[in-house]
Amino acid sequence: MTQPVMSKPFVILVAALAIPAPALAQADSAKADLIPQLVARLDLERYKATIKGLTRFGDRRQGTDRNRAAVDWIEAQLRSYGCSDVSRLKYDYQPSPPSPEGRGGQGVRTRDTSRASGGGRYRGIRARTGVNTDSLKQPDARLRALDTPPSVAGEREEVYCTKIGTTHADEMYIVGGHMDGIGWGEAANDDGSGTALVMELARVFSAPDVHTDRSIRFVLWNNEESGLNGSRAYVEQRRALQGSKEEPKWLGMIQHDMMLFDHGMPRADGTLAAVQRPEADVNIEFQSSSKFAAEAQQLAWVFHAANEKYATDYPASVGSHMTNTDSAPFQDFVPAISLRENERGTQIGAGWDPNWHQPSDLYATYNDADFRLGLNAAQTTLAALAGLVGATIR
C-alpha cells in the first residue's frame, strides 16, 4: 500500500532538527528565542491548580451530573483563556450489555499473556492491576458520596477549542487528553493530569500576542474509560469534513494520558518507591502496526528533540507500543502519538502505577516531583508544537 506523503511543515521541522548546531546558530535570533519564551509561560502552580480544579468533580465518570459539570467548567476555563471556536461534539453512548463471560458482550477472548497490550513484552516484576468498583474502599465519605451516582446511557458531550492559524488555517494538529475517570477517586492523574496539560497549552497558545501559521485544536475527550468512545465519535463524525472551514486537514494527533507517576518497577512484594525515581522520563509512544507508523515515529522523535532542548527536569524516551488511549482511533488516518508517565502496555499494565483506576488517585497523593513530570510533558509538547505550527510572538 502506498504510504501517505508527509505534510510540508512536518518535513521541514524534521529536517531542521537534524541541522548541526553551527548552522542552527545562524538562524534568525528572534525565532530562536521564541520557544523558550513560550515554554516559560508554563507554570507548575498553574498546572497544579488546574488539576485541583478538575478534582472538585470527583472521578468525572461519563454519563453523570458530575461529568457534565466538569465539561461545563472546562468550557468556561477555555473561554477565559480566549481560545477561539469553543465547541462541543455530541454523540450517543449505549454500553454493550453484559455477557455471561463478563466481557460486556465481547465473549471469551484469549491472548498471549506474555505480551502486553500494544505489542510489547512484559519484563521484570509484575503487580496486580484492575479497576476498583468497591465504593467502601474510598475512605473519604464526601468523595464517596460525590462519586456514587451511576452512569446513565444517552447523549454525551465533549468540549474543544481551536487556535486558528494565520496563513494555513485549513491545516491543524489535534492535541488531546481525556477528562473522564473511574475508580472511586478523583481521577487526578488518570486523566486530570493530561486534561490540565492540554488546557494549559490552550492558555499559552491563546494569548493575544501568540500567532501560529497553522491551527491547533485542543480536545478534552469524554468516554475514554468506556472504550475510547468520545475520540471514536470525533473521528466518525469529522474525518470526512477535513478541508472544510469547520474541520481543517489533520496533520497529526498528540494525546496525553497519565502524566505524573514514574516511581519505577514494583518490588517483589508489590510495593513501589514512595518518591519519583531520579531516572523518571516522559514516554512518547507511536504504534508500529498503524498505517502511519513511519510518520508517527518521526513525529515522536520531533517531540523527543523538543524535550532535549526545552524540558527543564526530565528526559523523554520513544517507544513503538502506543495503545489504549484516544490517539488510537486516529492512528490509521494521521500520524498519532501519545505522551505518558510510563509505557501503557508493558509498564502501567504491569502495575507500575498503583493508583491507576483506584480510590488513591487523588490530588493529595502526588507531590511536586510528580507534578513536575507532567509539567515537563507540557513543555515538550508546547515546544514541539510551536515549531510545527510556526508560532510567533508579536
Predicted features along the sequence, with ranges:
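His/Asp/Glu-rich mid-to-C-terminal helical/loop segments that flank catalytic regions of hydrolases
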Residues: G345-R394
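N-terminal signal peptide c-region/cleavage motif recognized by signal peptidases
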Residues: P20-P22
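Second-shell loop/turn segments in exported
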Residues: D33-L42, T55-R66, A145-P150, D180-G192, ...
